[in-house]
C-alpha cells in the first residue's frame, strides 16, 4: 500500500483528530518551554515527546491506508499516552502557579480528550454504532484502489455499451463495473471490424473490441449468414451480465446471436467459468442496504440481508460477488461475516 495524502484527506475523522492533536501538542510544548524548568516535572517532557510520536504514527498509517491493520496496537499505545497526559495535568495544575505550567496543563487536557476519543474509536468494533457513525462520513469520499492491475474502464466507454444494447436486443452488455484481476489489460475500444449478425437478417452492429483480443469465428464453422462467435476466453472477468439468459454454444465459444437452439441457463458462473482467478472463501450478510457510488465503477450495490461471497477481507473494502454474478467491492462495515 503506497503512501498517499489522498488516503488521509479522504477521511474527515483522521483530518479532524490529527489536526486537533497537533494544535493541542503545540500548546502543551509552548507551556512546557515557558515554564521554570527547576519546578517543571522532568518526566512530563517524555510524555510530550511520546505524544507527538503517536500522532505521527497515526498520520502515517492513515496515509498508507492500513490503519485497520494496527487498531489494536494503537489502543495500547494511545492508552499509555492517555496516562502520561492525565498525570502531567494533575502535577502541573495542583503543584504550581506558573503561567507556563498552566498553559502546558491546558494542552495536556486537550490531548487527554483526544486520546480518549482514539481509544474509543480504535478499540470499538467496526459494527458498533459509534464507529459506523464516524465511518459514514468517509465512506463515499475515501479513494479505492482498482482491483488488480487492469486499466479502469471510463464512464463514456460503459455508456457506449449501454446505448448499443438499448438499440439492438441481440447485443447484450458484458461490462463489469469492477476491474477484475487477471483480466486482459487495455481500455475497451469501439469500432471492431467484426459484426454480430442477427438471425432475422436485420442490420448488424459493430461491438467494441474486447481488451487484447478480437471477435472471431471458430474454424470449421461456416453458415450462410456469417454468424460470428466470441470465445469464452474473451469473456474473462466480465461477470456482470444482464438478467436475461445467455445462449450457450458449447466449450469452444458462446453464441451471441439468436440463431442458437441450444438450451439456455441463468448467468451465474463458477470460478473456473468466469476466469477471475478469485476464490471467494467467505460468505457475508448485508447489515444495511448500500447504493454504489456512481463515480466509482468498482463498487457494487446490495440490499439488506443479502448474502454475498467475499474475499480479501483486509481493510475497509472487501472484494465481493453477488448471487447474480456481479463482482466488485463493498464496504466492510456494511456486511457481517457468516460462520460456514
From Swiss-Prot:
Chain ranges of the SH3 domain: 279-340
Region (Disordered): 192-271
Keywords, ordered alphabetically: Cell membrane, Membrane, SH3 domain, Stress response, Transmembrane, Transmembrane helix
Acetylation among keywords: no
One term under GO cellular component: plasma membrane
A GO biological process held by the record: regulation of actin filament polymerization
Biased segments, Polar residues type: 194-207, 229-246, 255-271
Membrane topology: Multi-pass membrane protein
Annotated disulfide bonds: none
SMART domains (UniProt xref): SH3 (SM00326)
Residue intervals annotated with topology Cytoplasmic: 1-12, 64-65, 123-340
Transmembrane segments: 13-33, 43-63, 66-86, 102-122
Parts of the chain on the Extracellular side: 34-42, 87-101
Compartmental location: Cell membrane
Signal peptide: none
Listed CDD domains: SH3_Sho1p (cd11855)
Alphabetized SUPFAM superfamilies for the sequence: SH3-domain
Family: Belongs to the SHO1 family.
Record note on quaternary structure: Forms homooligomers.
Protein's job: Plasma membrane osmosensor that activates the high osmolarity glycerol (HOG) MAPK signaling pathway in response to high osmolarity.
Name the record gives this protein: High osmolarity signaling protein SHO1
Provenance organism: Candida tropicalis (strain ATCC MYA-3404 / T1) (Yeast)
Highest classification ranks of the organism: Eukaryota, Fungi, Dikarya, Ascomycota, Saccharomycotina
Underlying gene: SHO1
Amino acid at each position: 500500500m503506497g503512501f498517499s495524502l489522498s488516503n488521509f484527506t479522504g477521511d474527515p475523522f483522521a483530518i479532524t483528530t490529527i489536526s486537533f492533536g497537533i494544535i493541542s501538542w503545540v500548546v502543551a510544548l509552548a507551556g512546557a518551554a515557558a515554564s521554570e524548568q527547576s519546578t517543571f516535572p522532568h518526566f512530563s517532557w517524555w510524555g510530550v515527546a511520546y505524544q507527538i510520536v503517536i500522532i505521527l504514527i497515526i498520520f502515517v498509517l492513515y496515509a498508507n491506508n492500513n490503519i485497520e491493520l494496527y487498531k489494536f496496537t494503537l489502543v495500547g499505545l494511545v492508552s499509555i499516552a492517555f496516562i502520561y497526559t492525565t498525570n502531567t495535568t494533575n502535577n502541573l495544575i495542583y503543584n504550581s502557579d506558573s503561567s507556563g505550567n498552566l498553559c502546558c496543563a491546558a494542552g495536556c487536557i486537550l490531548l487527554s480528550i483526544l486520546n480518549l476519543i482514539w481509544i474509543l474509536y480504535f478499540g470499538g468494533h467496526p459494527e458498533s454504532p459509534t464507529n459506523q457513525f464516524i465511518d459514514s462520513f468517509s465512506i463515499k469520499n475515501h479513494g479505492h484502489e482498482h482491483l488488480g492491475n487492469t486499466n479502469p474502464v471510463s464512464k463514456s466507454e460503459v455508456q457506449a455499451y449501454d446505448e448499443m444494447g438499448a438499440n439492438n436486443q441481440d447485443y447484450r452488455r458484458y461490462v463489469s463495473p469492477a476491474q477484475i484481476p487477471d483480466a486482459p489489460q487495455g481500455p475497451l475500444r469501439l469500432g471492431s471490424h467484426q459484426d454480430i449478425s442477427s438471425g432475422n437478417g436485420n442490420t448488424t452492429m459493430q461491438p467494441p473490441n474486447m481488451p487484447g483480443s478480437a471477435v472471431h469465428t471458430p474454424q470449421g464453422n461456416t453458415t450462410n449468414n456469417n454468424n460470428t462467435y466470441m470465445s469464452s476466453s474473451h469473456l474473462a472477468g466480465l461477470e456482470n451480465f444482464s438478467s436475461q439468459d445467455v445462449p450457450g454454444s458449447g466449450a469452444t465459444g458462446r453464441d451471441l446471436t439468436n440463431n442458437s437452439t441450444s438450451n439456455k441457463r441463468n448467468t451465474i458462473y463458477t470460478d473456473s467459468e468466469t476466469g477471475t482467478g478469485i476464490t471467494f472463501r467467505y460468505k457475508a450478510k448485508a447489515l444495511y442496504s448500500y447504493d454504489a457510488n456512481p463515480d466509482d465503477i468498482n463498487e457494487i450495490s446490495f440490499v439488506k440481508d443479502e448474502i454475498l461471497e467475499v474475499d480479501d477481507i483486509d481493510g475497509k473494502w472487501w472484494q465481493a460477488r453477488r448471487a447474480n454474478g456481479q463482482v466488485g467491492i463493498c464496504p466492510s462495515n456494511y456486511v457481517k461475516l457468516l460462520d460456514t
